[in-house]
């Protein structure tokens, strides 16, 4: 078996979510208003009880309240928001409670199916609870009986959001404020997986019965051209086939098409639900075994086992009349059907690097 990219040996550094950044900055701005303290760092408590100190870039009085900002540090995770300035603007109110608003760079929900109602700022439930808990504790500590209006922003967030799935999910105008633990674990890709789930939920809520889960742009284009599906029906799953299949257990659709490059699909066919090379490898001997079951002779099997890439193995098989693409799709289909409810009609498509279909099964 060949792994396509080397694993990173050095320990990876964790970071903090945008939800943690929003909590720290809103607390700092509120404390400046309630207690008169301007901090250069602030301690917050994460959902699992860890206490962390977060550095502030500024904390200052404004014309209508106070504001504070921090630089988002995602550690060694390839996070689109790493290095962005996350800020909070807080105003005191006579009405008790905490009210949230979308500032520059934070999106607004425009479609049903997400965890937030249409019209709400895209500040997810856990960050909202984190901020509310900290602000309630601050009010109790200083005997403040009023409420807080909290506006969260991300500098450059509207442009950064175009690199995320927010536009497709119907979150317009900027990023989402995310996080369930407050911590970004390198390469956990929890935000990406959450966006896959949200994409399925949005499609269901908007009456879409047929979705296509695709590994990338080329497979998306292939599915769009083949079926004429709207963007809302196209789920960009990347390497996370398992995230799609497992979510359909509790949020089923009538029909699922999965489409990806031949190499990626061969990993799913072998039973791997994470298709990234860090977690699964292309098994050329297994491809040769499947080819043998379809009539491949010994010479072809040996050539496939010695191939440099899955694409080379596919080319060898097809040249000898062995429908390896269909075989891989059939095995991938069996893996998927073992996970999703029987009510979901599943089909598989494999494509080459040019986006041409090289195999299918249904």
From Swiss-Prot:
It comes from the Bacteria. GO terms for biological process: anaerobic cobalamin biosynthetic process; methylation. Keywords: Cobalamin biosynthesis, Methyltransferase, S-adenosyl-L-methionine, Transferase. GO terms for molecular function: cobalt-precorrin-5B C1-methyltransferase activity. Its EC number is 2.1.1.195. InterPro entries: CbiD, CbiD_sf. It catalyses: Co-precorrin-5B + S-adenosyl-L-methionine = Co-precorrin-6A + S-adenosyl-L-homocysteine. It holds the Pfam family CbiD. Signal peptide: none annotated. Pathway: Cofactor biosynthesis; adenosylcobalamin biosynthesis; cob(II)yrinate a,c-diamide from sirohydrochlorin (anaerobic route): step 6/10. Belongs to the CbiD family. This is Cobalt-precorrin-5B C(1)-methyltransferase. It comes from Burkholderia ambifaria (strain MC40-6).
